[in-house]
UniProtKB/Swiss-Prot annotation:
Pathway: Cofactor biosynthesis; biotin biosynthesis; biotin from 7,8-diaminononanoate: step 1/2. This is ATP-dependent dethiobiotin synthetase BioD 2. It comes from the Bacteria. Substrate binds at residue 42. It is found in: Cytoplasm. Belongs to the dethiobiotin synthetase family. One of its GO terms (cellular component) is cytosol. Its EC number is 6.3.3.3. Its cofactor is Mg(2+). Catalyzes a mechanistically unusual reaction, the ATP-dependent insertion of CO2 between the N7 and N8 nitrogen atoms of 7,8-diaminopelargonic acid (DAPA, also called 7,8-diammoniononanoate) to form a ureido ring. One of its GO terms (molecular function) is magnesium ion binding.
Amino acid sequence: MGKIIFVSGIDTDIGKTIATGFYAKRLMQQGFSVITQKMIQTGCQHISADIIKHRQLQGIELTAEDLNGITCPYLFRYPCSPHLAAEMENNPILPSKIAQASALLAQKYDYVLLEGAGGLAVPYNSQQTTLDYIVEQQLPLILVTSAKLGSINHTLLSLIVCQQHKIEMEAVIYNTYPLEDEKIAKSTQLYLQQYIKQHFPNTEFLVMDRQ
């Protein structure tokens, strides 16, 4: 059975999709078989746009699991929060369906990288959030952060919440693209590296530039 790792971010549009493909490619270069999965995709039809991007970054074609929907169990047309998109299409999101899809993939691949939608507190129904899913499934986490002003606050809040919920931190990926202010980016990187080294000594810190 392969290892399932959740990928989330400190905010929406933080670079999770690129980071997921980046990390998948990195594992592939180490000799592992890797598949990515999208928990929920909104603003899309037919095949998840994020899955397509993952495959481009991995340098592979779409898989059979992509074409039959296993790598993205929930696909909604309207570009909004998952809970609203599901409500609009009268298609409630069931965590069991996502978990079953991940388990199927884990039977075939060494690693399954499961990318979430938005940040940790994004709701996928009226009662449950992404964080709830990670905790319930006991999944290790890759957290994607950025060099933008304000990201230290968002990153630390996310890490503190994960610590409180005893979530295993697999890695933190520091996305430097787009580089808006080099001085802020370097200072933020140094601060986060030191913080993670002190509070999460077993967590890998990776820097990702434009892919």
